[in-house]
Amino acid sequence: MMFIPATLGTFVLASLLPATVGAGIPNAAADVAVRALPNAPDGYAPAEVDCPSTKPAVRSAAKLSQQEQDWLKKRRMKTTGAMADFFSRVKIEGFDAVAYLVGNADNVAKLPNVAIAVSGGGYRALMNGAGALKAFDSRTDNSTEPGQLGGLLQSATYLSGLSGGGWLLGSMYVNNDSTITELQKGGSNSLWKFNRSILEGPDDGSSGVVDTAEYYKEMIKEISRKKAAGFETSITDIWGRALSYQLINAPKGGPAYTWSSISQNSKFQSGDVPFPLLVADGRNPGEKLIGGNATIFEFNPYEFGTWDPTIFGFVPTQYIGSKFEAGTLPSDEKCVRGMDNAGFIMGTSSSLFNQFALHLDSQDLPKVVKDSLRDFLSSLDEANNDIAEYKPNPFFGYAKSTSPFAGVKSLPVVDGGEDKQNIPFHPLIQPARHVDVIFAIDSSADTELAWPNGDSIIATYQRSLNSTGIANGTSFPAIPDNNTFINLGLNHNPTFFGCDSSNTTNPTPLIVYIPNSPYVTHSNVSTFNLKYNTTQRDAIILNGYNVATMANATRDGNWPTCVGCAMLSRSLERTKTAVPDACKQCFKMYCWDGTLNSTKPDVYDPKLFLTEVDLQSAAKGLHASGKLSLVAAVVTLLSILLV
């Protein structure tokens, strides 16, 4: 029997809405301790609380928050030691990098300020990004051996993600800085059990298969409590709850776990981990398309807001459910906490269902399915249920002369990659953060066969040139066109952009662009594929590890040295230190030199660099396999939402 949306909706409602709601479903992984902080006052439902003595308010984005400034003092000290450890293993011929770091340790502003950005792209981005972070993490077995890059993560000040990359960050941080190894190990007892899609629900680890109806009942129960408390709900609520069951190690998907609670984690407070940043886009009232001048929002443990001139302001993350007006809380309003549910924040950064609705005609689906989905999604769009709704709008009445959101009671937010900036550069190129180098992990599906072709990094460069002034003082290195990316192999191998800082007027970070490429498996799986067996999951993570290390430096024995040179480059400029000859050779090898080749290339179909991993029952090159998975997701989740 084949269900069309209306039939499936009736079926779902009939089977998932009994008179009483049953007990919760545990989701515990044997090797990942439950260490995050479930500090929401009333589970998933936001609730009023007493305000602190100084009431929260919108602040200008003219500088970093005082909290971030104080945190940076701790983190930069930790990264100095981590970089010294890194360079004790990664050598630069003719240059003592450790002595250089020690000699400038009295002024951390002289030292490298490193950031890592993990792109969107669903589970593909999560797994490929996980492989890179696993390679960069000195806690990973053998990652500090010759040819490896372990310690780069510990050397980073900032770590940004959006969509699938945001899921990766959320799963790591909400589970108290768990390693990728911890998240994936344990087979059937691992936290990352992607062999059961979020449509089915998690495996409870004892009976083998959890009851799917019970799983949906629990999600409906929590979301209904939020709605009963007077807050808007949308598809992002059910999406975020479903993601939480798979990514957060807590019973019922951790409904009380918040994004702001990361700031209360002891590892974060002591500066032992990078500063996590999630990115999402604002959708202007009355619009459906997300353009290059869309307002870009960031979620960090302390604040939510934007550096863009439209709003240029931030509010405390833990209080985003409060009824701010013109930047302050009225005297008769209490504070509200709990709106920043960790799953809802991760879901916000990946709320791409409205994007799917806009591209139905390009999908290889039966006409009856397209028509039914279009009607279904259109009915939701009329009520703005296809996006994440932040109501009350924390920026209501704020920046009235410039903000498209100042006059609306609800702030509509969507997937951070919908403006084509699928790599979350935006929070890292803000002048106030003084980032020197960004290691950009690009898992985008730009080409016909779902490999990157530079679209994301090009979009950020184009935004920096936007005549509307939306870039607001940010600077970005020159980037070539898509065809040049493919013709010159810039999407096939790591490439440095912005090597010569004299080519830009304002300080600009060096970009180390690391595109998804096939090493041991075809990792070009669909953004909309929701299910992977453990073998394929581990193969894609291993592939990402090889992408980041260039096959443990077997493709280029100097790759670790060149990574080190990229880290040091801007710092050497600031201290007027001569660039080592070894680094000059690296820059000659990896820097884009401005050459263009814009002729139309053949279909980009890269071959494996190494011996292919045996995927057993997993399919190879699943770049087109996710369409019906997303159809099922949309139909099922929206049916539930319309209760």
UniProtKB/Swiss-Prot annotation:
Name recorded for this polypeptide: Lysophospholipase ARB_05919
What reaction does this enzyme carry out catalytically?
a 1-acyl-sn-glycero-3-phosphocholine + H2O = sn-glycerol 3-phosphocholine + a fatty acid + H(+)
Q: In the Enzyme Commission scheme, what number(s) does this protein have?
A: 3.1.1.5
Q: What does this protein do?
A: Catalyzes the release of fatty acids from lysophospholipids. Phospholipase B may well contribute to pathogenicity by abetting the fungus in damaging host cell membranes.
Q: Which PANTHER family match?
A: CYTOSOLIC PHOSPHOLIPASE A2, LYSOPHOSPHOLIPASE 1-RELATED
Residues annotated as signal peptide: 1-22
Q: Per the UniProt entry, what is one GO biological process?
A: glycerophospholipid catabolic process
What is the scientific name of the source organism? Arthroderma benhamiae (strain ATCC MYA-4681 / CBS 112371)
List, alphabetically, the SUPFAM superfamilies matched.
FabD/lysophospholipase-like
